[in-house]
Amino acid sequence: MIDSILFDLIEREAKRERENIELIASENFVSLGVRQAVGSILTNKYAEGYPSKRYYGGCFVVDDIENLAISRAKELFGASYANVQPHSGSQANMAAIMALIKPGDKILGMELSHGGHLTHGSKVSFSGMLFDAYSYGVSRDSEIIDYDDVRRIARECRPNLIIAGASSYSREIDFKKFREIADEVSAYLLCDIAHTAGLVVTGFHNSPIDVAHLTTSTTHKTLRGPRGGLILAGKESSMIVNFNNKERTLENAVNSCVFPGTQGGPLMHVIAGKAVAFGEALMDEFKDYISSVIENTKAMAEYFVSEGFRIVSGGTDNHLFLVDLGILGITGADAEKVLESVNIILNKNIIPFDSKNPSVASGIRIGGAAITSRGLNRDDSIEVARFIIRALKTKSDYELKKIKCEVVEFISSFNMP
């Protein structure tokens, strides 16, 4: 690399990744094949439009690449339609929402503080700025989605769109129940599986593809691909919607909302990386990987419970869980800082009905996808939980330094993908 300053920074990041235990639920480690595609000469090509309908010449090769990504995405998810151009999950959500409803319409999404996402109706997001947003949450007793309460809220506010999905919810979501509620109030249903896509495509979680009108996802997290977004549709893909006062098929409306509605030229190098990741996820080994992710995550959660900690909702069905730090009398922000000092990386997280500000929070979010990509098994994951608890309980700087040395030695024995 000619730029020595940047090369040194990248090498520093590579060292950080090697020597840290990565537990951020939205992060993962991509394969060499994905990195090669994303770092390829495809970054040179501008390709506004869609395959065979570009606004630039010389696109016959990237047409084949995008078509490959589309066909693999459709096969992987069992979808009738796929748009692989969204630059991120948030942009996928924006395009999907705009294809279904118009500004000022009502949306009903999961409360951010209960595990939802900014793009599901938060006032600081386009979804709360451009639309009349309402929210549902979890039961105070079980900390699990109360579908009867979702139905009650939907009947009261009569939304045009219901969004099912979450960013810090550890239980499987029943998409069919959401569709029943949406149909009762004549609303569209958008399912956001950004966090659980890997579990959906391997059959560990139920699929929303033929249940929802549209499904969105990121391509990283549990899919283990490059950072990016994806929009999918099943049997509803050819339904007619009113888009800009014209009758259009749903897939046509989505295409228009991605380009030119919210984006210009697609990132062809990233789309190539998506194609690689979809191909990897179609292999039998990927199902084994996801099975291990679930096993490792459950093992960590169960160990925390055995040590007296409270896990939000009592456990996990997926790749993440939330730990209530009340037993220690510290905040999520405190925990995040202490753990980073011993090379354990995770994030502070508010818990349902939290009395603390999100910048402080009462909990932490722990994800098992990235450590599983490095080859950690169930026993290794329990050892990770032990490191966390030791670091959070100690008051000694000497002990923290000792734990850091142990963490570096432990995690460095596992290869990066």
Swiss-Prot record:
Q: Which GO terms describe its cellular component?
A: cytosol
| Disulphide-bonded residues | none
The protein's matches in SUPFAM superfamilies, at most eight in alphabetical order, are given as: PLP-dependent transferases
Q: What is its EC number?
A: 2.1.2.1
Q: Name one Pfam family in it.
A: SHMT
Q: Which UniProt keywords apply?
A: Amino-acid biosynthesis, Cytoplasm, One-carbon metabolism, Pyridoxal phosphate, Transferase
Enzymatic reactions:
(6R)-5,10-methylene-5,6,7,8-tetrahydrofolate + glycine + H2O = (6S)-5,6,7,8-tetrahydrofolate + L-serine
Output the GO biological process annotations, alphabetical, semicolon-separated: glycine biosynthetic process from serine; tetrahydrofolate interconversion
Which domain of life does the protein's organism represent? Bacteria
Q: Which GO terms describe its molecular function?
A: glycine hydroxymethyltransferase activity; pyridoxal phosphate binding
Annotated positions of the N6-(pyridoxal phosphate)lysine modification = K221
CDD domains tied to this protein: SHMT
Localization of this protein: Cytoplasm
The UniProt record lists the keyword Disulfide bond:
no
Q: Where is this site: Plays an important role in substrate specificity?
A: H220
Q: Name the pathway it acts in.
A: One-carbon metabolism; tetrahydrofolate interconversion; Amino-acid biosynthesis; glycine biosynthesis; glycine from L-serine: step 1/1
Q: Which family does it belong to?
A: Belongs to the SHMT family.
Q: How does it assemble?
A: Homodimer.
**What the protein does?**
Catalyzes the reversible interconversion of serine and glycine with tetrahydrofolate (THF) serving as the one-carbon carrier. This reaction serves as the major source of one-carbon groups required for the biosynthesis of purines, thymidylate, methionine, and other important biomolecules. Also exhibits THF-independent aldolase activity toward beta-hydroxyamino acids, producing glycine and aldehydes, via a retro-aldol mechanism.
What protein is this chain from? Serine hydroxymethyltransferase
State the organism of origin: Borrelia turicatae (strain 91E135)
